[in-house]
A protein has these predicted regions:
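Membrane-embedded alpha-helical segments of transport systems
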Residues: 62-69, 88-104, 120-125, 155, ...
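Membrane-interfacial helix-loop connectors
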Residues: 72-94, 102-121, 197-234, 243-249, ...
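Interfacial loop-to-helix junctions that mark the boundaries of transmembrane helices
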Residues: 2-10, 111-121, 179-181, 294
Length: 310
């Protein structure tokens, strides 16, 4: 292994680190800015499931973690402050809200012609401004805003690092061979998505990494579909762990989270497998970052909104 490969590996690892740290920093700043309002909002929910879905989506979009939202829900159910019906609605909304990060990442799809519209163009500036705000402001609210700004900047700078480290090797046979294997085996693709998301404790982060690979034109459509479905299931691990030692109703709330996502994986995985068998050219097509965002949003939203009608 020559020095170029080692350098690219270090750059990719650094990119993942910046992306994850940026996302967590942004989420922490948003949570502190909102204070206890989000928990109060959850506590005041009525039995209106549609309202619960909207609230779950909004809260998850703010804190960038469906797992964290579901953990809060499990805690409320365990304390008797929320019914299972209310919890199910919030969990549905939490899964929909987690797709926001995918759309933010997909903005990196903008090419040089629209460089000034690409958030990555402003990433270093945002990091600098946010750092000055954090260091020199004496007000907590302003410092929280600085954390949000730094987090956004680090998130996009991390994506840039990951993308640039992969770019020189996109023509390497190992990429095409790996995604061909994953694309031809739905269970393998779903399993990879589950494992990566469970390890990172964030479906937003794992989807973001997949989108970065897609930006470099190395991800086939069938592989991306199966991996994304697995990522949705993997996002349930945190809530399942948090439900240990809680009441039966709280455990049911956590189980509903994973059941929704398994149902979605079975539905879209089956439909995808049939379509890819009929149209092999579609399966081999290199998917874009935006297309991953579209599928991620549609699959999650359709599954949960259909469940809400039943």
């Amino acid at each position: 292994m020559n020095i170029e490969y080692i350098s690219s590996l270090f750059e990719f690892a650094g990119g993942i680190g910046m992306f994850l740290y940026g996302m967590n920093t942004m989420a922490d700043g948003m949570q502190r800015s909102a204070g206890g309002k989000m928990k109060k909002l959850l506590g005041y929910l009525t039995s209106n499931r549609l309202l619960a879905i909207i609230v779950g989506a909004v809260i998850t979009a703010i804190i960038q973690s469906s797992g964290a939202t579901t953990v809060m829900v499990v805690g409320f159910v365990n304390a008797g402050l929320m019914t299972l019906v209310q919890a199910v609605g919030v969990i549905m909304g939490a899964n929909i809200g987690t797709t926001i990060t995918a759309w933010i990442v997909s903005l990196g799809q903008l090419g040089d012609a629209a460089k000034v519209m690409n958030p990555s163009f402003y990433a270093p500036f945002l990091i600098g401004i946010g750092a000055f705000v954090i260091l020199f402001s004496k007000k907590d609210k302003v410092k929280n805003a600085g954390e949000i700004i730094v987090g956004i900047g680090l998130l996009f700078e991390g994506l840039t690092f990951m993308s640039s480290s992969i770019a020189p090797y996109t023509d390497a046979p190992i990429f095409s061979q790996a995604f061909q294997i994953v694309g031809s085996n739905p269970f393998l693709g779903i399993l990879i998505g589950i494992i990566v998301t469970a390890v990172l404790q964030s479906s937003s982060a794992s989807v973001g990494i997949l989108q970065t690979l897609a930006l470099n034109g190395v991800v086939t459509t069938n592989a991306a579909i199966y991996i994304t479905l697995g990522q949705n299931i993997g996002s349930c691990v945190t809530a399942l762990i948090s439900s240990a030692g809680t009441t039966r109703t709280a455990k049911r709330a956590a189980c509903m989270h994973i059941l929704f996502n398994i149902a979605g994986a079975l539905l879209f995985g089956t439909v995808g497998f049939i379509l890819f068998s009929i149209y092999p050219a579609l399966a081999a097509h290199n998917i874009t970052s935006v297309e991953i965002s579209v599928f991620h949003t549609f699959s999650v939203s359709y599954t949960h909104l259909r469940a809400n009608e039943t």
